[in-house]
Amino acid sequence: MASSSIYVPAKEMISFLSFADFNISDIRIREVPTNPLNPQLQKIVENLNIDYPKTTKELYTVHKIYHQNEVINSGELPLTQESVGTRRLFYIVLAMMLAQMNGNEKTIVIDEFDDSLHVELAAALVRIFNSTENLNQFIITTHDIQLLDSDLRIDQIYLLDKDFHGISDLKSIFDFEDARNKGRHDISFAKRYLQGRFGAVPVIDVDGLLDVLQMIHEKYGDEHGKNKK
């Protein structure tokens, strides 16, 4: 059977993570025992005569251990136990590298791009996406309005507006005359977005939210408090 493995240059991956200020000194693949199946699945596997593997490959990150600014040791951690932000960056970098290695003309879609990423790191990645070294097309979604003022052209920014029927409408900032009349560096799109210049701002009734919480407290709070005593 032909191997379905894909090659990723580990040295370059580690260098990229290091430049992104992540303390990962190496990446290793370990053979680890597979998780046991529950009784029902185990029975199905046996009835179908499926050869369930006893081991599986798992990715580990290696971190340097410091004491008084000196490296005294290193430790391994499964990628699955890394923080959400570290895993997020790892997957983004992996997608970028695979695209670079396979023609550098791919379209990569990343939902919730900034999830658990520091805003400076997210902005740096956007600059990389727009660099001359990158010929791939990235389509990203984000809730971080600070990225509106990152290294993006006006025609690259789209906002998703939802009406009272719950129907979403995708519109470009380029379509707003107010945005086109000024140079890219003369305007804060994030500030104007918060001012409602482009729409797509959620209408939140804070007083209504507080009223609901107060109503819950008055209706259930005292009764539950008595039951606990």
Where are these regions (language model features)?
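Phosphate-coordinating catalytic segments in nucleotide- and nucleic-acid-processing enzymes
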Residues: M1-A99, G103, F189-K229
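A short acidic (Asp/Glu
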Residues: P39-Q40, E120-L121, S150-D151
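Histidine-centered active-site/metal-ligand motif
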Residues: H63, H118, H143
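Walker B motif beta-strand of ABC-family P-loop ATPases
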Residues: T107-V109
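Walker B catalytic acidic pair
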Residues: D111-F113
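Conserved D-loop-proximal element of ABC-family nucleotide-binding domains
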Residues: D115-V119, A123
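C-terminal lobe/lid and adjacent interdomain/linker elements of RecA-like ASCE P-loop ATPase modules
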Residues: A124-K229
